[in-house]
Amino acid sequence: MRTLWIMAVLLLGVEGSLMQFEMLIMKLAKSSGMFWYSAYGCYCGWGGQGRPQDATDRCCFVHDCCYGKATGCDPKKDVYTYSEENGDIVCGGDDPCRKEVCECDKAAAICFRDNMDTYNSKTYWMFPAKNCQEESEPC
């Protein structure tokens, strides 16, 4: 029941590049970002603290860092453009913020795909925040 509530809340807040991020994850990792990565480990989902728990959680940590480096941008709302060329995602457009956000999302989706074998829902799905108290490493 708690999972359904979280999914409903997340869907209400999805706009702009968050929906595009979901589409990139589905395209590259062949899984739903909102379902599989919205409440995983210490960094996948809203916020993030502590140390990444595994390679999948590290994808989210690096993604958070990437968004943090996109100064002057609004990564969760900046709508970007991308295309597919020879099976690769190519971020486009003239706006540097939107292109940077696209590159962050693309890198995370590729990271999820490349680390599918580390995804451990029994241990890290709905991981309690109290287990994420270690000092975080720098971006």
Curated annotation (Swiss-Prot):
CDD domains: PLA2c. The keyword Coiled coil does not apply. Its EC number is 3.1.1.4. Residues 1-16 form the signal peptide. Ca(2+) binds at residues 43, 45, 47, 64. One of its GO terms (biological process) is arachidonate secretion. Its cofactor is Ca(2+). Keywords: Calcium, Disulfide bond, Hemostasis impairing toxin, Hydrolase, Metal-binding, Platelet aggregation inhibiting toxin, Secreted, Signal, Toxin. The keyword GTP-binding does not apply. One of its GO terms (cellular component) is extracellular region. Disulfide bonds join 42-132, 44-60, 59-111, 65-139, 66-104, 73-97, 91-102. SUPFAM superfamilies: Phospholipase A2, PLA2. Gene3D superfamilies: Phospholipase A2 domain. InterPro entries: PLipase_A2, PLipase_A2_Asp_AS, PLipase_A2_dom, PLipase_A2_dom_sf, PLipase_A2_His_AS. PROSITE patterns: PA2_ASP, PA2_HIS. Binds 1 Ca(2+) ion. It is an enzyme of class 3 (hydrolase). The active site is at residues 63, 105. It is found in: Secreted. One of its GO terms (molecular function) is calcium ion binding. It catalyses: a 1,2-diacyl-sn-glycero-3-phosphocholine + H2O = a 1-acyl-sn-glycero-3-phosphocholine + a fatty acid + H(+). Monomer. PANTHER family: PHOSPHOLIPASE A2 FAMILY MEMBER (PTHR11716), PHOSPHOLIPASE A2, MEMBRANE ASSOCIATED (PTHR11716:SF9). Snake venom phospholipase A2 (PLA2) that inhibits the ADP-(IC(50)=272 nM) and collagen-induced (IC(50)=518 nM) human platelet aggregation in platelet rich plasma. Exhibits very high hydrolytic activities toward the synthetic lecithin, and prefers the anionic micelles (dPPC with deoxycholate) to the zwitterionic micelles (dPPC with Triton X-100). PLA2 catalyzes the calcium-dependent hydrolysis of the 2-acyl groups in 3-sn-phosphoglycerides. This is Acidic phospholipase A2 Tgc-E6. It comes from Trimeresurus gracilis.
